[in-house]
Amino acid sequence: MNKREVNVLHQELEIYREMGIPLYLNGKKSTPKRIEKAYRIAEEGVYMRDYIQDDTGRLKGLSFDFVREEEP
């Protein structure tokens, strides 16, 4: 990720945090800063974003899980 992309991600995650939406990184509660760092140093894979909703479709959490890239 370039510097601009990291800044955009940070701003987005801070908005969710301010809204009280829990953030998770690989299944554990996390912070915008930790998620940002994981994105920057990820090698041999990417982070998949998963929006967690309640029964009414309202956002109740945001999860980032590492997914390994398969070799061709």
Label each region the model flagged.
Residues 31-56:
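Acidic, low-complexity, intrinsically disordered interaction modules
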Residues 1-28:
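N-terminal acidic leader/helix
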Residues 48-72:
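Short, compact, well-ordered microdomains
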Residues 7, 27-31, 54-57, 65:
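A generic structural micro-environment signature
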